[in-house]
Regions:
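N-terminal signal peptide c-region/cleavage motif recognized by signal peptidases
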Residues: 19-22
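Extracytoplasmic small-molecule ligand-binding "clamshell" domains
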Residues: 25-94, 98, 157-158, 232, ...
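Periplasmic-binding protein-like
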Residues: 32-34, 108-112, 188-225, 246-249
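Bilobed "Venus flytrap"/periplasmic-binding protein-like clamshell domains
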Residues: 33-36, 43-56, 117-152, 156, ...
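Extended ligand-binding regions for polar small-molecule ligands
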Residues: 51-60, 119-121, 127-132, 139, ...
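Acidic, polar ligand-binding/catalytic clefts
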Residues: 55, 66-128, 138-141, 197-201
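Ligand-binding clefts/hinges and TM-proximal coupling segments of bilobed small-molecule sensing domains
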Residues: 64, 140-159, 227-249
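Short helices/loops that flank or line small-molecule/ion binding pockets
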Residues: 73-85, 101, 161-181, 189-190
């Protein structure tokens, strides 16, 4: 009897261990840039507006996240060419449309030109006034500048580790073309000097996207989870939490 009891206990423990493994949430790679307040990697439990929403959606859909942050052009390439890999925030545009599975928009973001002393009203005016414009390499902003006819000599694609706000403050570039909340957030951490913002010249949704080859069930679950987070007000609350205190102009 003792031997049977011992064997039974061993079997039960093995069964419980196997059950815990099989019931664990499957891990999915999530590629994000360090782009506060949209996505953050080094601020404790804070992951930024898009980061928090993406993680909440993944947890709700039954997935755990393995967060990765390679250089943004490489991140886009790896996700596009991979299988069942997630990426956020990603702007949906013509050049990217066929390369990804677009799960759902998380946030709408305005883009503008930022400078120390010149306000412009359009791409055309910016093209005539600014000699050198800093812009994130591999971003939708860089693509848009090229589509709007800016010369290569006017575009400064930022390298890894370069701080566009510092470059603008030191006069190394004339302007910075970027998302409004991100630019205000970074500038506020750097200086009290006024930052001159142009009229908003570009507005687009930021998506949670997946590899072109993506599990339809995962897409459906994540899409439903984001829809729920939008309807119950979670997305608005998270955005308000991160943008509180940022200058309006």
């Amino acid at each position: 009897m003792k031997r049977i009891s011992c064997c039974t206990r061993v079997a039960i423990r093995a069964l419980l261990a196997w059950s815990s493994i099989t019931c664990a949430a499957p891990s999915v790679d999530l590629y994000v840039p360090e782009a506060p307040p949209l996505t953050m990697l080094t601020v404790g439990d804070q992951h930024g507006i898009v980061g928090d929403i993406a993680l909440k959606a993944m947890a709700s859909a039954g997935y755990s996240a393995n967060t990765l942050s390679p250089p943004w052009p490489r991140a886009q390439r790896e996700v596009s060419q991979g299988k069942d890999l997630l990426i956020a925030p990603l702007t949906r545009n013509q050049s990217r449309e066929a390369n990804y599975t677009w799960i759902a928009p998380i946030l709408t973001m305005d883009r503008a030109f930022f400078s120390l002393d010149r306000r412009v009203e359009s791409f055309d005016e910016a093209r005539k006034i600014f000699r050198l414009i800093a812009v994130g390499i591999g971003t939708a902003q860089e693509t848009r500048l090229r589509e709007e006819g800016f010369a290569d000599s006017q575009i400064y694609p930022l390298k890894i580790g370069e701080n566009p706000a510092q470059m603008l403050l030191k006069g190394r570039v004339d302007a910075w073309f970027n998302g409004v909340p991100e630019s205000r957030y970074i500038w506020q951490q750097l200086t009290d000097r006024p930052l001159v913002m142009s009229r908003v010249v570009m507005t687009a949704n930021l998506y949670l996207a997946c590899s072109k080859d993506c599990d339809p069930q995962m897409v459906s679950r994540l899409r439903a989870a984001i829809d729920t987070l939008e309807k119950d007000g979670t997305i608005d609350r998270v955005e308000a939490q991160y943008t509180k205190g940022l200058p309006v102009r």
